[in-house]
Amino acid sequence: MSAWVLAPALLVVSCSFPDEKDDTDPIETGSIQLQFDNIVGDQDLQLDSAKYMNAVGEDFTVNKLNYYISNIKLVRMDGSVFTVPQDSSYFLIREANPESQKLTIRNVLTGDYTGIEFVVGVDSLRSVMEPSEPGRKGILDKDMGPTNEEAMYWDWNPGYIFLKLEGSSDSATTANGRYYYHIGGFGGRTERTLNNLKTIKLTFPGQKAIVTTSIVSKVLIQADIQKVFNGPAQLSIKQSSSLMFSDSSKYVADNYAGMFSVKEIKIN
C-alpha cells in the first residue's frame, strides 16, 4: 500500500524543474518619420498658382507632381544598415495630398542613424508580380487607390510611372500649352528595356537621427523640382514638351536623382 502512496509523490518531484532563465536581450525598436517637402529652388512648390523659371529661361507652372519612394534603408552610425521590410517600403508622394508626404517607418532598430537610402520608382520584383498578389496591393494596386486615381501605371507598357510632373509653360509646343513628363522603366520583363530606377543616398548633415522606444526623429527631405530641368542635362520645355517611355526619359531620371537633400532633423 505504501508503494502506491509514494508513487504520485515521486512523480511530482521528478517533474518539478527550476525556472529556466533567458539571458537573451530583447530587441528594442522605435519609429522614425520622413517628411518630404517639394520646393522649386528657394521657393515652396505651389500647384497651379505660382510661376517659376527653369535654367534655360522658360517659365512654367506645376499642376501635378507625384513620385514613388521605395526600398528604404537607414544607415547607422557604425556603418551597418537597417533595411525596412519590403512590404512596408513603398510610398507614393503626391504634392496635392500633404498626408502622403509624411512617412512613418515603424519597428526600426533603436540606435543612432546618420544617413538614408531609397529608390525613386518601383523595382522590377514588384513590377513583374501578378497584380492579384498581395505584394501588388495597397499603394501599388493599379486598379484602385492612389495609383489608380493618379494614373501612375502604364497598362499599354506594363509598369509604374516613377515620377509624373505636369504643368503649363509659354514654351510648350503642345496644342494646350502644357508639358508632360511621365518617367518609368524598370529594365524590362522578358527583354532588356529602359531602366530609370534611381537609388538615392543621403547623409544627415552634421546631425544624427535618434531612434529609441520613446524618441522619434523627424527627417525633413527636400525635393527641388528645379533640378528636374537643371541637372547633368539641361532640359528645355520647348524642345521636350512631352516625355514618356523614350530614350530621352533617362536624362530626366538622371536629373531628378539629384533633387533630394536632407534639410534638418527634429527630435521629438
Outline where the language-model segments fall.
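A short, solvent-exposed, low-complexity linear motif enriched for acidic/polar residues
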Residues: F17-N268
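C-terminal motif of bacterial Sec signal peptides marking the signal peptidase cleavage site
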Residues: V12-S14
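Bacterial N-terminal signal peptides that target proteins for export
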Residues: M1-V5
